[in-house]
């Protein structure tokens, strides 16, 4: 049996204000934002989950129509081995590197707002290790920005993972352990 759907069409009209110079182009008056902002970056020992609501409030503006969040969660396995727990260690300049990565992405992609924090120290299975938030007027730009920041943090920020495997052995990830 076929159903009949009523469709209500809405007509929109683009209008230009009388005084274009009076507009705030930050996006507060219906204009897409230009320029990008790194809202916050950090390396911390504190759990990331309690930061989410405040981070979202800082990243979002009325001009942002999309928020993409990458939340890297500690899992109980890695490359076929069962993981009991892990700890991250960071180079003393890791904060500078994560800020640099976010600034690069902000320079490459117009109209994004970025927030990125990596946790160090012991982290339990199921907890967040890296959280990236990217807001933009449209989802494609927000997805691109979030992916670029997450990928570059993993590739370039000097942070190393020490995994305690279920069999009692220890495995370092991100550290060259081959003999010199």
Question: Language model features by range: what are they?
Answer:
Residues 2, 7-129, 135-147, 151-180:
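N-terminal, polar/charged subdomain of small-to-medium soluble alpha/beta proteins
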């Amino acid at each position: 049996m076929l159903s009949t759907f009523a469709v209500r069409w809405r007509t929109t009209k683009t209008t230009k204000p009388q005084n274009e110079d009076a507009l705030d182009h930050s996006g507060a008056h219906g204009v897409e934002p230009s320029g990008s902002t790194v809202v916050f970056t950090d390396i911390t020992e504190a759990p990331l989950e309690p930061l989410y609501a405040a981070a979202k409030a800082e990243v979002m503006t009325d001009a942002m129509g999309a928020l993409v969040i990458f939340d890297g969660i500690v899992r109980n396995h890695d490359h076929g081995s069962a993981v009991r727990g892990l700890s991250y260690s960071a180079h003393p300049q890791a904060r500078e590197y994560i800020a640099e990565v976010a600034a690069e992405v902000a320079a490459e992609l117009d109209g994004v707002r970025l927030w990125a924090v990596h946790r160090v120290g012991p982290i339990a299975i199921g907890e967040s290790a890296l959280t990236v938030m990217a807001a933009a007027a449209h989802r494609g730009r927000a997805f691109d920005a979030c992916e670029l920041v997450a990928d570059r943090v993993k590739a370039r920020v000097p942070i190393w993972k020490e995994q305690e495997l279920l069999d009692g052995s220890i495995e370092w990830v991100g550290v060259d352990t081959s003999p010199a």
